[in-house]
């Protein structure tokens, strides 16, 4: 199900590497500027900015929230959280937690100027009932000019590592306090074989999003090749591949801009590609175009040119990562 929003009016920031982007203060400043409440000359807030964190990819583990929101706090933003797994508020495990957005959480969303949604790694957001409610809410907040920050969660779908056992709830919660870094779990060599999935998102924006597009994973797989292969199974949709050091900024006035994350020690230090590419399947072949540094959103994003194909393995792997309504993933999409 796609929303009927005008993509020209949507404000958003969609990096190839969300952790690296949110550690770059220039990116934070650009995000804040989109709210209309930030004085760029003074590099300070001109009025209150509320950031709502939705921990979709990390099961509401506190250290991820702290890592992703620390620079917004440094700029004086208020932070609220909408818990997806809700394990801490209910005392239940994510497998048995409630899956309804509470009135308080809806109020946080109503007062938000920025909504931060980490990558689409697990399935906790995508239980059928919660997803439909989330789509309605996300569409409403996007329509009123709230800035969306994240990755594939906001698109129709994402090239996702959700089949990786190390992104499942039980594994991540078991190692919740093992490391100090707030970065998501990295893929490791020598584990069980798994494939990248086309995991459906909230459909605020059309297309299939691929983060870290020019990178290789820990097994040596080149993600842009994996993404092209995936698109042949979803030939009606456009792919948007964003490199690790690139950031796609939607200005809300029909324009987009490509930002560059500063080169820094860590994952992106050796990454030289700073591009965003669009990919279309034409007569069975994937055609790739590197977009300009700025341009029209209507030329960047397009609706599917035919029926949308759902990844049949999405439900299969969701059953290996159970949440309260996982079984509803087996129902036909509406």
From Swiss-Prot:
<dbReference type="InterPro" id="IPR029062">
    <property type="entry name" value="Class_I_gatase-like"/>
</dbReference>
<comment type="similarity">
    <text>Belongs to the cyclin family. Cyclin AB subfamily.</text>
</comment>
<protein>
    <recommendedName>
        <fullName>G2/mitotic-specific cyclin-1</fullName>
    </recommendedName>
</protein>
<keyword id="KW-0498">Mitosis</keyword>
<comment type="function">
    <text>Essential for the control of the cell cycle at the G2/M (mitosis) transition.</text>
</comment>
<dbReference type="GO" id="GO:0051301">
    <property type="term" value="P:cell division"/>
</dbReference>
<keyword id="KW-0132">Cell division</keyword>
<keyword id="KW-0131">Cell cycle</keyword>
<keyword id="KW-0195">Cyclin</keyword>
């Amino acid at each position: 199900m796609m929303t009927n929003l005008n993509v020209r009016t949507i404000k958003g920031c969609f990096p190839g590497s969300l952790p690296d982007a949110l550690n770059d203060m220039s990116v934070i400043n650009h995000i804040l500027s989109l709210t209309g409440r930030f004085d760029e000359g003074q590099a300070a807030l001109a009025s209150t900015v509320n950031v709502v964190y939705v921990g979709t990819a990390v099961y509401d583990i506190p250290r991820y929230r702290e890592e992703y929101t620390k620079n917004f706090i440094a700029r004086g933003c208020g932070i609220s959280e909408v818990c997806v797994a809700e394990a801490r508020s209910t005392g239940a495990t994510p497998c048995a937690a409630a899956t309804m957005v509470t009135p308080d959480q809806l109020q946080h969303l109503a007062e938000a100027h920025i909504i931060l949604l980490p990558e689409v790694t697990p399935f906790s957001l995508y239980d059928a009932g919660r997803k439909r409610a989330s789509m309605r809410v996300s569409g409403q907040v996007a329509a009123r000019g709230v800035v969306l920050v994240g990755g594939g969660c906001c698109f129709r779908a994402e090239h996702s590592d959700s089949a990786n056992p190390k992104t499942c709830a039980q594994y991540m919660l078991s190692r919740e306090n093992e490391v100090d870094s707030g970065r998501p779990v990295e893929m490791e060599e020598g584990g069980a074989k798994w494939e990248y999935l086309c995991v459906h998102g909230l459909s605020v924006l059309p297309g299939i999003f691929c983060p870290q597009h020019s990178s290789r994973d820990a097994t040596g797989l080149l993600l842009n090749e994996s993404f092209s292969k995936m698109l042949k199974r979803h030939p009606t949709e456009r792919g948007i591949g964003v490199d690790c050091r690139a950031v796609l900024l939607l200005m809300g006035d029909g324009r987009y801009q490509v930002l560059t994350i500063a080169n820094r020690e860590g994952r992106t230090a050796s990454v030289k590609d700073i591009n965003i590419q669009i990919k279309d399947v034409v007569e069975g072949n994937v055609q790739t175009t590197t977009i300009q540094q700025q341009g029209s959103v209507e030329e960047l994003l397009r609706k599917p040119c035919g029926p949308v194909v759902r990844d049949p393995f999405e439900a299969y792997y969701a059953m290996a990562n159970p949440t309260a309504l996982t079984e509803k993933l087996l129902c036909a999409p509406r």
